[in-house]
C-alpha cells in the first residue's frame, strides 16, 4: 500500500511538472506583445482605465486612439514610437504625465510656457536675498531673511528639499520679531507633499478641512471611491500668528499647488501673484511591455468645496511683474506683498 501511494504521489508530481510549461505558455499568450502596436495598445489601455481626469477634462480617449493608432507601424523605430506615444500623452494636458525610456523623457509644459513668468531669479537672488555669506540664512532648502522694513521673507525653491520640524522652529524663531511674513513659492515645481503639510501646519491653531481625495475603484472613467476628507492638523511646536502672504506663479505646481490650497484655507493668509500651474492628481507609475515607464495622475485632489484644482488655484490678489520695475531690478510682486502687509496698499478687486 505504501508503495502504491508513493507511485501515485510521484505520478501527480510528474503531471504537475508537465503541466507547468503549458500554464506558462497560456499566461504569455495573454500578455501584450512587445511590438510598436502592442506598446501603443498597452499605453492607451493604462490611461483609459487608470487616468483620473478623462471625464473632467472632457477628453474623448477613443477618438485619441483612432488618431494615433494610424501612425503606428510594425517597422517604426524606437525613437519614432516614443514620439507618437509622447504626443498622445500630451493630449491629456497634464504636467504629471511622462513617458520615460532609456533615451528620453516626454514632458507636457504648456501649463506654464504660455503664461507670464512673473519671476526673475536674478532679481530675487541679487537684490532681495543678497549674499549667502552675510545677508540671508538657509535651512533645509529654505532661504530666509528680515527685510529692512521688518517684513520676514522665506524663499522655498522645491518641496523636494526635506524640511524638518527643527528647521522650522529655528526659522520661525528668527523671524518672530517681524510684523508680517512673505513665503515665496514661485517657480517651485513641487516635490513631497509631506513637506507642504509640515510647513502649513505652522500657520493654523486648529484642525482645518483643506480638501478631499478620491481613488479609482474600477476601469470606468467615473469609477471612483467616495471623497475622503483631508484635514490639516496644527503643529505642536512654534506656530506663526501674524499676517502672511504666499507668492505664486504658473510654475507653482504639484506639491506647491497642494501647499497653496492648504494655506488658502487659513484666516491670516493671503495668496498673491498669478494663478498656480495646478497638478492636483496623485501620480502613479506603470510599465509598458518594452520596459518604458509611464507616470500619470491616478487620484484626483479637490479643495474644501469639492472643486477641482487640477488647472490651478487663483490668487486672492492678482499681481503681475511690471516690465518697468524689472529694468530697475524691482520685484513687483514682492513689493506689493510688503506694502500689503504694512497696510500701505489696499488692492482693487482685480489688479
Which positions does each model-derived feature cover?
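Hydrophobic alpha-helical segments, principally membrane-spanning helices and signal/leader peptides
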Residues: 9-10, 169, 191, 258
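Bacterial Sec-dependent N-terminal signal peptides
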Residues: 1-34, 351
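Alpha-helix termination/capping residues and helix-transition junctions
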Residues: 20, 175-177, 238
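Generic hydrophobic-segment detector
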Residues: 8, 14-16, 181, 281, ...
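Flexible, low-complexity junctional segments that flank or bridge functional domains
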Residues: 26-181, 185-215, 222-229, 243, ...
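C-terminal "post-core" interaction segments
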Residues: 27-41, 58, 79, 151, ...
